[in-house]
């Protein structure tokens, strides 16, 4: 795994997107002397490719400016969260090549958040409301109609404080009361119409157990967690732009830098205390065609067994992309290539695939394999003919060294490399025609062997002994070159040919009454059984190769071993997707 360090990041060409420009200005004007960002996922599912953009931005910005990035689990909704998700998130961030300066949980700050809520109550800025969720929606109003104040909006601070403490004591059932901010029920921004700060949920928490029957709402917890951790720039996607006034309201009215007594619970835990006045900045989220990235829809794909789990190589989770053979370097290159802006757009899936091709072309050793094998017998060689040929591991990188490749009288070739009735421009095998066998010489087809049904089952041919590389006959011109695998030495392998999960660019488009389920690509996974050269089998899981003329493949993360090789196709050699 490649690791991104501050030195590495600072050595890269200067990036000039609007977020980095803001940070440069803040540093130049003395607004901040150091940069501190955070990546705050909720541990209620697996990270997907959209999160990769946020991870690269949050950690990348911190590294570029010599700062820090905190990984924070936003664990305020315990009924949907799981320690397994939290562990997977840490694994994914590390896999991408990033390291956090501290691992935190919003639950680490529950005592501080509670004290902050009591401060707002005492200041007359928050009240306990008895409206249920349906009534709250009715009172909130619409985009064109002002909301109505709750009947309990004018409770006294003393009464509110007593009720809030009873909420914490577990006196009331779920959903019967909330703590709400007292802001403006006529605001044009619905997020400011007395939003909830706390709700009652008698649910056991993965970190705090049954200590808390109340939990803070996202906007309140997120803003104050940023301030508690000393975050300088809170980077969010555009859907949080309308939440920014509430973010600022929470930070300004709690005012942690001037109310240090609220941080005492952190002192008792030994946590650092350097509260800040963070600035929220929004950027466009990542949208890619041929995908869905809604957590609800991804969960449905798994629960309905439309895919084979969260790490199915067709999924757009980081776990799935990793198993497919995507590399951290390719993911980071993709994020760099699409850039950072405030304009929502849809990125073509081919951009992601091309980033992987570009990376693997540089690093992946070459091997030979056949995925639709057919026998070629070179009849002018002895039946026991066997030799070892020397092949480079990479044609453009001598540092990757060489390997020995066995060669014999009987070879496996690709069935698609032979045609009895070739189309115009055909450059491969035909009856009586010649082709160059990669690294072994020129072969001529003398006989086509068929079964009783008339299907071709084997070819018999002749190898020109003067056409080996380095011999005079090697310069004789033939139209095509094909790959092969020595049949006696070949290792049988399971090869999984993956393609796009959806068959149309916008699987989320429900205008004709269909859903994304109706657009699943029936050819997104095909399993074939082929043959590979021995050097491809003797390798660990998650090792990438270019199978010459076939594409880039990776040994499966879970199912591969030397006795049962399993390869996943990561990407074809070129974009062959047929668009409508």
UniProtKB/Swiss-Prot annotation:
Keywords from the UniProt entry: Aminoacyl-tRNA synthetase, ATP-binding, Cytoplasm, Ligase, Nucleotide-binding, Protein biosynthesis
Gene Ontology MF term list: ATP binding; glutamine-tRNA ligase activity
Location of the motif 'KMSKS' region: 292-296
Keyword Ligase included in the entry's annotation: yes
Gene Ontology biological-process entries: glutaminyl-tRNA aminoacylation; glutamyl-tRNA aminoacylation
Catalysed reactions, semicolon-separated: tRNA(Gln) + L-glutamine + ATP = L-glutaminyl-tRNA(Gln) + AMP + diphosphate
The enzyme's E.C. designation: 6.1.1.18
Residues annotated as binding ATP: 42-44, 48-54, 237, 285-286, 293-295
Domain of life where this protein originates: Bacteria
Location(s) in or outside the cell: Cytoplasm
GO CC, any one term: cytosol
Database matches in InterPro entries: Gln-tRNA-synth, Gln/Glu-tRNA_Ligase, Gln_tRNA_ligase_bac, Glu/Gln-tRNA-synth, Glu/Gln-tRNA-synth_Ib_cat-dom, Glu/Gln-tRNA-synth_Ib_codon-bd, Glu_tRNA_lig_a-bdl, Rbsml_bL25/Gln-tRNA_synth_N
Family annotation (Gene3D superfamilies): Glutamyl-trna Synthetase, Domain 2, Glutamyl-tRNA Synthetase, Domain 3, HUPs, Ribosomal Protein L25, Chain P
Location (main, coarse): cytoplasm
Subunit structure: Monomer.
Name of this protein: Glutamine--tRNA ligase
Organism: Xylella fastidiosa (strain Temecula1 / ATCC 700964)
Gene for this chain: glnS
């Amino acid at each position: 795994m490649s690791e991104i360090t501050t030195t590495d990041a600072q050595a890269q060409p200067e990036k000039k997107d609007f977020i980095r420009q803001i940070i440069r200005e803040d540093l130049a004007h003395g607004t901040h002397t150091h940069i501190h960002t955070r990546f705050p996922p909720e541990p209620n599912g697996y990270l997907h490719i959209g999160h990769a953009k946020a991870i690269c931005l949050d950690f990348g910005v911190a590294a570029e400016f010599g700062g820090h990035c905190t990984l924070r689990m936003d664990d305020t909704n315990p009924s949907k969260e799981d320690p397994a998700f939290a562990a997977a998130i840490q694994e994914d961030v590390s896999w991408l090549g990033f390291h956090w300066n501290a691992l935190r949980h919003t639950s680490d700050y529950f005592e501080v958040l509670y004290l902050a809520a009591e401060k707002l109550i005492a200041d007359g800025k928050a009240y306990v409301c008895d409206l249920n969720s349906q009534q709250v929606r009715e009172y909130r109003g619409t985009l064109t109609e002002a909301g109505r104040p709750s009947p309990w909006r004018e409770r006294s601070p003393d009464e509110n404080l007593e009720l809030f403490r009873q909420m914490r004591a577990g006196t009331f059932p779920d959903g019967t009361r909330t703590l709400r901010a007292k802001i403006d029920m006529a605001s044009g921004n619905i997020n400011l119409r007395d939003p909830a700060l706390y709700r009652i949920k008698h649910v056991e928490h993965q970190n705090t157990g049954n200590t808390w029957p109340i939990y803070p709402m996202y906007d309140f917890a997120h803003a104050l967690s940023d301030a508690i951790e000393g975050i300088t720039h809170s980077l969010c996607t555009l859907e949080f732009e309308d939440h920014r006034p509430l973010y600022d309201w929470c930070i300004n009215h709690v005012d942690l830098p001037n109310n240090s007594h609220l941080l005492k619970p952190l002192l008792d835990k030994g946590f650092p205390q350097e509260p800040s006045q963070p600035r929220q900045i929004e950027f466009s989220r990542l949208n890619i065609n041929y995908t869905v990235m809604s957590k609800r829809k991804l969960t449905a794909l798994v629960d309905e067994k439309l895919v084979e789990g969260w790490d199915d190589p067709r999924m757009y989770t980081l776990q799935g992309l990793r198993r497919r053979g995507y590399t951290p370097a390719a993911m980071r290159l993709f994020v760099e290539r699409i850039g950072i802006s405030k304009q929502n757009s849809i990125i073509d899936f081919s951009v992601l695939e091309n980033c992987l091709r570009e990376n693997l072309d540089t690093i992946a050793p070459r091997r030979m394999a056949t995925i639709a094998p057919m026998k070629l017998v070179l009849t002018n060689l002895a039946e026991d003919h066997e030799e070892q040929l020397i092949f480079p591991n990479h044609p453009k990188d001598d540092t990757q060294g060489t390997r020995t490749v066995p060669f014999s009288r009987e070879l496996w070739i690709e069935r698609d490399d032979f045609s009895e009735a070739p189309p115009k421009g055909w450059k491969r095998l035909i009856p009586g025609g010649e082709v160059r066998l990669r690294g072994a010489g020129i072969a001529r087809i003398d006989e086509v062997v068929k079964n009783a049904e008339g299907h071709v089952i084997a070819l018999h041919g002749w190898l020109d002994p003067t056409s080996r590389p380095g011999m005079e006959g090697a310069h004789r011109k033939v139209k095509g070159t094909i790959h092969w695998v020595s049949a006696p030495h070949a290792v049988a392998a399971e090869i999984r040919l993956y393609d796009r999960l959806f068959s149309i660019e916008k699987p989320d488009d429900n205008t004709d009454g269909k859903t994304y389920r109706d657009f699943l690509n029936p050819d997104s996974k095909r399993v074939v059984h082929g043959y590979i050269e021995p050097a491809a089998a003797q390798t660990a899981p998650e090792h990438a190769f270019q199978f010459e003329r076939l594409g880039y493949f990776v040994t499966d993360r879970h199912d591969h071993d030397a006795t049962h090789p399993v390869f996943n196709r990561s990407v074809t050699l070129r974009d062959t997707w047929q668009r409508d």
